[in-house]
UniProtKB/Swiss-Prot annotation:
This is Ion-translocating oxidoreductase complex subunit A. One of its GO terms (cellular component) is plasma membrane. Keywords: Cell inner membrane, Cell membrane, Electron transport, Membrane, Translocase, Transmembrane, Transmembrane helix, Transport. The gene is rnfA. Pfam families: Rnf-Nqr. It comes from Thioalkalivibrio sulfidiphilus (strain HL-EbGR7). It is found in: Cell inner membrane. It is an enzyme of class 7 (translocase). Its main location: membrane. The complex is composed of six subunits: RnfA, RnfB, RnfC, RnfD, RnfE and RnfG. PANTHER family: INTEGRAL MEMBRANE PROTEIN OF SOXR-REDUCING COMPLEX, ION-TRANSLOCATING OXIDOREDUCTASE COMPLEX SUBUNIT A. It comes from the Bacteria. GO terms for biological process: electron transport chain.
Amino acid sequence: MTEYALILISTVLVNNFVLVKFLGLCPFMGVSRKVETATGMGLATTFVLTLSSVCSYLVNEYLLAPLGLEYLRTIAFILVIAAVVQFTEMVVHKTSPLLYNVLGIFLPLITTNCAVLGVALLNVQEAHGFIESALYGLGAAVGFSLVLVLFASIRERVAVADVPLPFKGNAIALITAGLMSLGFMGFIGLVK
């Protein structure tokens, strides 16, 4: 049980995929202008990341490894992720058309979010079991969502602040992301 808690804490706070591993930077910068959009994207990514992590584990463990097709891992994982994203897109479209319209092009772009593929590949590399894979995917997704929503709320405040002209736009966003990364470094001592 302690091992499971450590997986969650380490992926959410200590080894955050955005701020430490630099995965998922495209949606991190692209969808973080408004908290509502960031929250929707975070929820969709959480669902996709967790489900694709589990599905990728199953495909690798019961299809690729027994047949000796490990060299097809990346392509197989991309196909699994694309299928999960399509499923998520259909669910969001049916349950929340407003969120579907707000997310726009970013929802299908979850397919190309390198954090999703990174989690699937790191699960294999670290030889996680089924539960560990699910928790690793969930922790990475919660960490991604947490950072995305925090960053969006900071960007909303910075948008109305008196920022010097050379720092407006992406410059202040990157500085803010760097400061957030420094803040998350304070969690390094939690997990050894």
